[in-house]
Each structure stands twice: as C-alpha cells, then as structure tokens.
Amino acid sequence: PLYSYKVFERLSAGTGYTYFGDGNYDEVFYDEELDHDFASWVFGDSMEPTYLNGEVVLIKQTGFDYDGAVYAVDWDGQTYIKKVYREEDGLRLVSLNKRYGDKFAPYDEDPRIIGKIVGNFMPVEA
C-alpha cells in the first residue's frame, strides 16, 4: 500500500511554539508509513548526499535535542534544513555539502527550531 503525506512548501513559526504550514501543500506518496509531525521539501543541493533536491523530509516537533543533529529552522522568513550547533550568540547552521559555508542565525533575530529531521524519502508515483 501507499501512504499519503502532506508536504508543505514552507513552515512558519506561529504564535508561541506552534508551527503550521503556509496552506500550500502537495500530497505525495511513499510505500512506508513514517511517524512525523510535519513534512517539507528539500530545495537545492546544500544537504547532499544525505538529503537530495526534490526529496521530502519528515520533522518531529522536538525542540532542540543535541548539537549536530539535523533540524528544520525558521529564520529570517525562511525554513532551513541544516545541522545545528548552539553557540553563545546564536545558532550555527551547517550544510552537509562542503561547497556551502555555514550560516549564522543570531539569537536577536529569533531563529526557531521547528523540529528534528527524523526521515526522508523520494516520493513514489501513486
């Protein structure tokens, strides 16, 4: 059987610590049922080879778990999928693809951890 996933174009911080999709989502299918709170698209190659452009990432709304895990982060109007390290003045967002430099999200710009990436897949045709 194929399982349906709602994949949001963008995840945003709501009031407090709730998150919601922007209302625009695609329904995609995969042959496994995977536990998650949100699903979003991978755009670009900055997280290759683990997360490929066009794949779906599955997110659990865990808050910050540990340094070096891969999280969805809402910062400066964008959703980033990156390895995250907490530093004194902000969050360091690290790409897996070495061609990309780190990004730094200062705490005074209110970067928010949406949740931890708990899975990824390339959708299958229904």
Model-identified regions with their sequence ranges:
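Short coil-to-beta-strand transition motifs
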Residues: 74-80, 108-112
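Glycine- and charge-enriched low-complexity intrinsically disordered segments
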Residues: 86-126
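Short, surface-exposed charged micro-motifs
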Residues: 83
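Short, positionally conserved secondary-structure boundary motifs
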Residues: 1-53, 86, 90, 119-126
